[in-house]
């Protein structure tokens, strides 16, 4: 493990680890409901698989996982803070994410819930990832960076309803929406949807603003009203990015979908 101590990168050995690693108390901007919800799920998981003993309790494991997801703390930092090994931290985090991901609602379930709403808002976001320039599949020309494309549905007040599986960043928003079956699900539910210009050509259920520079007055007024409604969907993006791990993901791209689902479940647990 390499840590930055007094401006120098130092390799930590077992013999001098206690002398060089500093641990301090900190806070997580989450409610105790998040902690109780996750701890309860982890305790149930341990009973299910017949776990007899572990280094830390379900409550401490839940706290560790929340620190990782919400604050973006690394495995090495968490290992030092909780007095366990880095490999153990990795296993605990992965287990918790898998447990939460299985609880995430499907698109069909969300459509049934949203059928009572006047409309929903659809938008796409790019979750930045740690990739080299050669990985063109993950490079978004729109955002000029590498990342994963995630589609988000919100209610009319901007509350997060659903987040899609993650696709490579080069995927266009409309292509992603069609890949996930969002357009077909909206049409089947006869649910109105507001979206930006990236979804031009999506069809009847999706309402988009007019394109072009020489628009008539009524078209400009329509676009202005459309933007005021659509901007509420940005609150959902802020909700996702409030979990600092999603601001720069360094894990395998195959695990990002489960991470997003885990965040969604934690958000719904206390919403």
Label each region the model flagged.
Residues 55-58, 143:
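Short, solvent-exposed segments of well-ordered alpha helices
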Residues 77-94, 98-271:
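Short, well-ordered secondary-structure "scaffold" segments embedded in the functional core
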């Amino acid at each position: 493990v390499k840590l930055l101590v007094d401006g120098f990168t130092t390799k930590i050995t077992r013999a001098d680890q206690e002398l060089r690693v500093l641990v301090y108390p900190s806070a997580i901007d989450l409610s105790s409901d998040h902690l109780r919800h996750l701890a309860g799920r982890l305790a149930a998981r341990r009973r299910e698989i017949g776990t007899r003993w572990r280094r830390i309790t379900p409550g401490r494991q839940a706290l560790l996982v929340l620190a990782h997801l919400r604050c973006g703390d690394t495995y090495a930092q968490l290992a030092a803070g909780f007095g366990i090994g880095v490999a153990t931290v990795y296993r605990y985090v992965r287990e918790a994410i898998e447990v939460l991901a299985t609880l995430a609602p499907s698109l069909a379930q969300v459509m049934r819930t949203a059928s009572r709403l006047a409309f929903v808002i659809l938008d796409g976001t790019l979750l930045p990832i740690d990739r080299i320039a050669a990985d063109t599949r993950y490079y978004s020309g729109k955002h000029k960076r590498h990342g994963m494309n995630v589609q988000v549905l919100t209610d009319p007040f901007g509350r997060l309803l659903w987040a899609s599986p993650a696709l490579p960043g080069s995927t266009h928003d409309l292509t992603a929406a069609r890949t996930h079956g969002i357009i077909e699900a909206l049409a089947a539910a006869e649910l109105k949807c507001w979206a930006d210009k990236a979804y031009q050509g999506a069809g009847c259920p999706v309402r988009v603003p007019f394109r072009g520079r020489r628009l008539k007055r009524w078209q400009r007024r329509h676009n202005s009203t459309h933007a005021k409604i659509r901007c509420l969907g940005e609150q959902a993006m802020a909700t996702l990015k409030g979990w600092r791990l999603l601001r720069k993901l360094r894990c395998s791209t195959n695990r990002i979908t489960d991470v997003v689902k885990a965040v969604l479940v934690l958000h719904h647990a206390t919403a």
